[in-house]
C-alpha cells in the first residue's frame, strides 16, 4: 500500500493470487462483532470502468508496464478484452463496503481477500484485486489505477489491469460517510457469468463481521446533556451518530454505524428508563450508552425534583377583600411550575367608642349606620 498525493490524499492497494488449485491455509477463527453500516452503491458508474480497462488492454501504446529495472518496458501484446462477470461484481460490491470499514486486502473479519470469492461461490484459477478510496468519479479512479507515471514498484494496479491470465472483471463502488470506495476484482474463470442484472444504485444497510480486537472507542450523541423532570413526569430521550473507532479505517476518525445502542440508567430509584425517562424520586443519576460491548464516555445527567421541596415564599396575586378570598401564588425554584393558595376574606371590624361590634352582612351594616345617623 502506498499513499498517492492529490487533493484527497487517496490510497491504492492491489493484490494478486495465482494458481489457486491449492486450498487456502485455514487460520484460527477470529472473534468478530457484527457491525451494520449504511452505504450508497454506485454500480452504474462502476461498470463504465470496464471499457476503460479494455481500451488500455487493446491499445498499441498504453498496454505496457515498467520492468523491475525501471528503464525498459514490457509491452503487453495481443491482450484480449475482459468480460464483465456479474458474480465477480457481487464480490466487488461486498469488498467495497468492507474497505469502507477497514481499508485493506485483509477483510474486516481478518480473513484473506479471496475468501470473499468463495463465500459468493465464485471459483477461479487466477484472481486479483485493486482497491481505492477517495476518488469521486470512475474516470479519476481509473486514471489513478493506471499509474502511468509510476515506476515498477508503483505499478501493481496497472499490472493487474494488463494481466494476460485474467479473462473477466467485476467492479464495486460504494459511497460512505463522505467518501467513495472502489474495488476491481479480476479472475480467470472457466465459466464467466455474463448474464446482465440491473445496476444497483440503492442505499443499503449491510452487516459486516469485524474483528472484535480492532474495535474501540464507542461514541454517541445524546439529544440533551441534561434531562430535568419532576417526580411522576416522563420525558423523551434520543441518541444519534453512534460511531466506533476501527483500526485500519480510512477517511474519517470514526466508523458511523446503524446499530442501536443500549441505554442504561445508573440509579433506578431516582428515575426509570423504558423508551422514555420517568422521574421516581428526588435525586440525580446518569444515563450511559453501550454497543458492541463498549461503553461510550459520553453520558447524560438526569435530575429529578419534587416541587413540594422547592416552592418559593410566594406572592399575593389577588388581595382578599372583606367579602372575597384572595390568591397567593408559589413558584418552584427548579422548574418554575406554579401553584396557588386561597387567602381567606378579611371580614368586617365594627368596634368603636360609640358602637357595639356586631358581625353582620354589608347590607345590615348600612341600615345600622343609617339609624345611628338618625339618632345623632
Regions picked out by a protein language model, each given a short descriptive name:
Residues 11-21:
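Bacterial N-terminal signal peptides
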Residues 2-12:
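Bacterial N-terminal signal peptides that target proteins for export
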Residues 195-204, 215-220, 306-325, 346-358:
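Disulfide-bonded cysteine-rich modules in secreted/extracellular proteins
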Residues 212-309, 325-328, 333, 337-341, ...:
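Extracytoplasmic soluble-region selector
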Residues 180-216:
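Low-complexity, Gly/Ser/Thr/Pro-rich intrinsically disordered linker/tail segments
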Residues 20-31:
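Sec-dependent signal peptide cleavage junction
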Residues 94-98, 110-193:
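A well-ordered secondary-structure block
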Residues 29-120, 158, 164-169:
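Short, well-ordered surface patches within globular domains
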